[in-house]
Amino acid sequence: IIGKIVVAGNVRRSAQIALGDHDDLDYLRAKRWDLGGIPNWRAMSNNSVVCDDIDQLPDEFWGGYEGNGEPYGLINLEASRRMGRTGEMQYPDPDVMGYNPCAEQSLAPFETCCLAEIYLPNIESEKELKKVAVYLYRINKHSLSIKCAVKETEDIVHRHMRMGIGVTGYLQ
């Protein structure tokens, strides 16, 4: 509901993710617009289903991929906990309870996500790409090091220092 209200320049400036059980049919029908009577604020979230085995998914899940409502993301929460961070799979991460709104980054309770993006069409050389990546890393690292308003957030953010740097514009 907040995302419906927070609009600037005709663009929604918020994001949220909803994680639901694979066998919760009401949740799986939350964006079935063809059924009618669904509040339009439900369009504001990215809905994903938590499931460890795709064989457990009911037919209702696949309906979004067949044009009935919206397709849902698929989250394997146990794998996220078991494997830990990318590149550090030898360290399990039992604190993971959720994800940022697009599920690029696993998060513990009270934790924030810290993401940056490199837009390749603006990069003219490999040297510049490396320079931009280093700057973004430093910016992320510094933003994660600042004092937070909520003590639980500060503790978990400073302990994990989770960040991500994405690359976009590859085909341009």
Write out the residue ranges for each language-model feature:
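Metallocofactor- and cofactor-centric catalytic cores in central/energy metabolism, strongly enriched
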Residues: 1
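Conserved, charged catalytic cores of large soluble enzymes
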Residues: 4-94, 167-172
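Function-dense linear segments that define catalytic or interfacial modules
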Residues: 64-172
